[in-house]
Amino acid sequence: GGAVLTGPSAPTRVESPLPGEIGASPPALSVPATPPVPVVNPPPAAAPSVQLTPPPEIANQIRVAILLPLSGPQAALGRAVLDSAMLALFDVANSDFALLPFDTAGTAEGAAIAAENAVAANVKLVVGPVFSDAVAAAAPVTLRAEINMLAFSNNRGVAEPGVFLSGLLPESQLARVIDYAARHGVRRIGALIPTGPFGARALDAARLAAGAVGIEIVRSREFGPSSPEIAAAVRLISNYDERRAALLAQKKALQGLENEVSKRALNRLSILDTFGPVPFDGLIVAASGAELVNVAAQLSNYDIDTKRVRLLGLSSWAVEGAGREPALIGGWFAAPPAASSREFNRNFQAMYETTPHGLGRAAYDLVALAAILGSQEGGPKFDRATLSSETGFAGVGGLFRFLPDGLSQRSLEVREVTPGGAKTVEPARSTFESLPN
């Protein structure tokens, strides 16, 4: 496995951080709702002849920026992510490590300004921002300053050397669950995907993953967000009209026959909605939330028997209540290992009296990684070669590694939806040796 992102790298001592910094001090009993704004440009000296020398503990600080939407429409998200980052700071960082939050205001322009302020504050690494447009705006600033970025986005279009994405990629999720499905008898797969760039990306990834394990995507249909659009997509992918017509034709052929065999056959047909199977034995449903519930409800309406067709999904299925949808029971999906994050979830709950945001594990792991690499003998190791170590890093989100092109890999487990929640049917691998690039 990779380097484990746990345990303090050196004893933590209490100190007063500079304005705008979150220093490596023990957690306070309460956390301010609004973090202080970093002071990038200190006031000038009282007289030009005075030479100001910072205290040794400030001069030796390893500064890392975290770019988050701390104001604007996404402020709640930004503050929730910052809470997880602070937990990593308290757990792992030593007293020389300082985390400086910069507000992107949830806009691309704000992200570029935040990146410029971070560079001016002499940071050595940037964590964040969250959204792909913010990453695209901030990256030129950090690259020009030769500072590497660990962003939260999963939009591979903004990845490049020096801009590493920690977001969970749909490509890796689909590759994992399709590989598992192929090893357990699934041969022909249909795909229900949302309209738009994400859906197109998911379909490309599914085709690539299926080809790699010798099976095929035989049908795909896009669905829009409304119930009628979802129903239409399910109707088309299931060949419902053709199968319905085949049933009516069978009934008509038998109705004129008076023998007992024909009558028994007609009785059997009378309880069916369609005649003949759907053209696949696995069905990818690239949906989450209300859309997933809506798709699940439509499957039985158009005679897709999920006892015969294995549903395959993404990590977004890892929500409470998935097992309440009968059509989803038995479905498989790939997700980060649940066991890795249990202690993190408990610690977060104890500190903040709430559950962590979905990006919380990534925030914790990236700040923990920064703290550990920042405390290496001989100085911080934030170079691209170290960040893209082949062995990777073991964090609360499981084993992960960055690739030289800026993308990332995660070792995922496969779970099955059950009435009582999802259960692990194949654990995540403990090393990257058996995982393809």
Please name every model-derived segment:
Residues 1-437:
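Extracytosolic ligand-binding ectodomains
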